[in-house]
């Protein structure tokens, strides 16, 4: 039987157990031995990180060939146009590659959203918008690069789900342990 931890990673935490100067790591939150992250999430992003004690499960979660969708709540600067949203849905050019098509929708600000520390910068004359963006790949800083490529920089990024696993009812810094078959 495999075990899986659903961890709601706070802003500023790095996705490794070894501490680095100036960063809080997973070891500050999870003390169970034998668990390793299945994928990563940047220190300046928040939300779901899955950790497991099973190498095969870790591969199935993190390997793009299994096409496990990752769903993000993204606060962007400005109000995206229909053209920008269609580009996200078709795939956009980021550096030297074209991203796979994404599912992208405008959304209301998530309910029960915790405050980010430090807070997102506020600009009185520039509105912000929330998007729900689902992708099946996970290249480094991909969501941030995708929104920037269509003209709307990411201000806050929260991974809400990986496949059917979500951070619903898990406070930042909190985690749930599941037994899987």
Predicted regions: what is each one?
Residues 1-181:
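RNA pseudouridine synthases
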């Amino acid at each position: 039987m495999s075990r899986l931890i659903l961890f709601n990673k706070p802003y500023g935490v790095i996705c490794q157990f070894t501490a680095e100067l100036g960063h809080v790591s997973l070891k500050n939150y999870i003390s169970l031995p034998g668990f390793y992250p299945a994928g990563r999430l940047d220190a300046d992003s928040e939300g779901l990180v899955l950790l497991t004690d099973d190498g095969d499960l870790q591969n199935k979660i993190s390997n793009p060939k299994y096409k496990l969708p990752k769903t993000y709540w993204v606060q962007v600067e400005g109000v995206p146009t229909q053209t920008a949203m269609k580009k996200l849905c078709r795939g956009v050019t980021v550096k030297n590659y074209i991203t796979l098509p994404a599912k992208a929708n405008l959304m209301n600000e998530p309910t029960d959203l915790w405050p980010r520390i430090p807070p997102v910068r506020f600009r009185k004359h520039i509105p912000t918008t929330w998007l729900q963006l689902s992708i099946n790949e996970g290249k480094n800083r991909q969501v941030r690069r995708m929104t920037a490529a269509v003209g709307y920089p990411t201000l806050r990024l929260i991974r809400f789900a990986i496949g059917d696993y979500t951070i619903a009812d898990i406070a930042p810094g909190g985690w749930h342990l599941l037994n899987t078959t």
